[in-house]
Amino acid sequence: MSYECFKLTLSEGIAHIRFNRPEKANSMIPSFWTELPTVVNELSRDASARVIVLSAEGRHFSSGMDISVFTEGGLDGPASGSRFVRAEAFRHHCMALQDAFTCLEEARMPVLVAIQGAAVGGAMDLITACVCRYASRDAFFSVHETAIGMTADVGTYPRLVKLIPEGWARQMSY
């Protein structure tokens, strides 16, 4: 199967998922959020993979969520309807985004991630959901949501404070 955001190879029990949008710094477009859980869940059901390795093509691991996630049928939700309907659509969308990374935690095999360059915003959410993280010397990390007035609500903080001291997690956020 082919994917817009990923290249998938499977060899000798190793499933290698590579982010494949280097021209856009591997930003997470709307299809990313459906493709990732599809790939991971299929591999989790398939007995031929013993481990999943995530990596990225290009200079940066990922620049995080693409702005189109907010506009193209994304967080905008329905334009009409009551405030309750819009709020419920927003909540449903956020839960779907969270589920895209929860599948990494729930996979039957370990998920490892190799990081180079930038790992910003949503990329931080993703790497905190993996079992092991390996970073190149040029890797840098940023929870960028707070800089633009957003809450990092795709799972960053609950996962991050399990990995590093809470003070460091707070410092990364500002």
Each language-model region and where it sits:
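Glycine- (often His-adjacent) and acidic-residue-rich active-site loop
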Residues: 56-99, 149
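Conserved CoA-thioester-binding segment of acyl-CoA-metabolizing enzymes
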Residues: 1-57
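A short, glycine- and basic residue-enriched loop/turn
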Residues: 22-25, 59, 68, 138-140, ...
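Histidine-centered beta-alpha loop that forms part of the nucleotide-sugar donor binding/catalytic region
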Residues: 20, 65, 116
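Charged catalytic carboxylate motif
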Residues: 31, 35, 96, 103
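Crotonase-fold acyl-CoA enzyme core
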Residues: 102-174
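Hydrophobic/aromatic residues within transmembrane alpha-helices
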Residues: 17, 54, 66, 126-128
